[in-house]
């Protein structure tokens, strides 16, 4: 039986996934939909988590939402290009070579409206990372998306991490990181099996700068991994 927190996360993931039907008329594939959703969710989640300082002024969620439907799509397309060249390093990497697959202004307006209507209070409380990872899992389980090769099921990841028993003294590297699941699980294991509040300054510095490394050459997947890692506190 699921916990209330899991039910909340699953409900939000289901609502987000169902929005892919909005894009069918635009000929958008499943993996293109998740990419599109990543752009929009990044802006919305930055607002909800009070981290909009990493985004340049004038290119944030409220700026997108405030545009009238006819001009919103044009603004959004220009914003993707702008964000790929401005803002924090993470912002620039996530939006590198970003472009929209949306063709109709009304389609974008529906997505913005529906995303804004989600239960963001409980999403913040239960964790943005689990929400986004649930969306990635949904995409991986959809055979038509072809994304399964980049997403390893969490039970398998957790089992492998439990066998390896990583510690803060280790260096964790995933040379084919996919959407970042192994790195996230290793980080969770380390923190749950130690007392981060008692780490020395040297240990904290090592944790932040010299513990987790990942490589992913497919840009689409690399983009998703960066978003996933950021929402789990690894950036």
Task: Cite the ranges covered by each PLM segment.
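Non-catalytic, mostly N-terminal accessory regions of nucleic-acid modification and defense proteins
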Residues: 1-168, 230-233
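Conserved S-adenosyl-L-methionine
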Residues: 146-235
């Amino acid at each position: 039986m699921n916990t209330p927190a899991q039910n909340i996360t699953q409900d939000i993931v289901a609502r987000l996934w169902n929005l892919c039907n909005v894009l069918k008329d635009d000929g958008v594939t499943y993996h293109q939909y998740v990419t599109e959703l990543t752009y929009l969710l990044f802006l919305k989640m930055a607002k909800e988590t009070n981290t909009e300082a990493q985004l340049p002024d004038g290119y944030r969620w409220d700026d997108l939402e405030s545009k009238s439907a006819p001009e919103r799509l044009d603004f959004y397309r220009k914003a993707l290009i702008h964000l790929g060249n401005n803002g924090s390093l993470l912002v620039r990497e996530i939006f590198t070579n970003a472009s929209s697959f949306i063709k109709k202004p009304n389609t974008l307006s529906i997505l913005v409206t529906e995303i804004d209507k989600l239960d963001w209070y409980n999403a913040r409380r239960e964790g943005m990372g689990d929400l986004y990872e649930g969306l990635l899992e949904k995409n991986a389980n959809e055979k038509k998306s072809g994304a399964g090769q980049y997403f390893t099921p969490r039970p398998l990841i957790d089992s492998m991490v439990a066998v390896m028993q990583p510690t803060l003294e280790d260096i964790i590297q995933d040379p084919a990181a996919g959407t970042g699941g192994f790195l996230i699980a290793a980080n969770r294991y380390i923190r749950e099996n130690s007392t981060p509040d008692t780490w020395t300054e040297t240990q904290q510095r090592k944790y932040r700068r010299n513990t987790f490394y990942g490589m992913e050459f497919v840009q689409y997947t690399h983009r998703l991994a960066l978003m996933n890692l950021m929402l789990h506190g690894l950036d």
